[in-house]
Amino acid sequence: MGKLNVNLCGIELDNPVIPASGTFGFGYEFAELYDINELGTFSFKGTTKDPRFGNPTPRIAECTAGMINAVGLQNPGVEKVIAEELPKLKNCFHKPVMANVSGFSVEDYAYTCEKLDKEEQVGWLEVNVSCPNVHGGGMSFGTDPKAAAEVTAAVKKVTTKPVIIKLSPNVTDIVAIAKACEEAGADGISLINTMLGMRIDLNRRKPIIANKMGGFSGPAIFPVAVRMVYQVSHAVKIPVIGMGGVSCAEDVIEMMMAGATAVEVGAANLVNPYACRDIIRDLPRVMKKYKINTLNEIIGGVQ
């Protein structure tokens, strides 16, 4: 059987498959379905400094080959995540976990990351810079290289854990933003977050989602994700996590050939809660089919 293990920012993973933040809760919810230790790791629900109740409903719209969501980072806040959610996770997951962090100011990001830095089970901090900067006219941190670099530098000051910056695809030049984060000290880049989308209810003549627009994800965005992973991984020297529309073992291989060291799976978990487990179990078959001995040998193999 081919070797599935990869090294992500100095931490060994049994395999490269990672459920994406926002599609896997805090992990323990899925532990009733299967042994989540089969996963490489997972990125838990986006966590902010203060509790957030999220956006008004409806928050979800179905699309051909995907979905739009505008959940609005609903979470109990970092204090409660540490006090209540992580202890439940420790009972069923015995590997380092990825903490996904969001914020609305540079100080927010630094505060939340500093709190999570003290948690032994947290292996990586995945910093979502797709949030609006309340001090920057509401523009997303991830759309401006300078703002993304500022968040990166602030987080690096308060943690010794690997910092992975999660980038938005809703930009003109994602490579410039990735390079700015790398220069500011990022240990890795994850991409892509959701694309901005909208659906309209023809009867009501109004947007389906109360927030009007939301994040479009699912198989339809996969080719865009592969292209951006390829571009970024060839421009930076730090590891890249690929995501966006991944739904089968072949997609994982394709992402890795494009340059990803590890691969996150998002919307597929909402369609099939066993998606990540099934993908991991199917990887040996796909590796055999394409004569791949180890996954490490294919990372960035497409020039």
Please identify what each model-predicted range represents.
Residues 296-303:
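A short, charged, Gly/Pro-tolerant segment at domain boundaries
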Residues 246:
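Short donor-sugar binding/catalytic loops of nucleotide-sugar-dependent glycosyltransferases
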Residues 104-241, 250-265:
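Alpha/beta enzyme core
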Residues 39-40, 45, 95, 122-125, ...:
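Short acidic/polar active-site loop segments enriched in Thr and Asp
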Residues 48-53, 132-134, 196-199, 270-272:
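Short gly/pro/ser/thr-enriched loop/turn and capping motifs at secondary-structure boundaries
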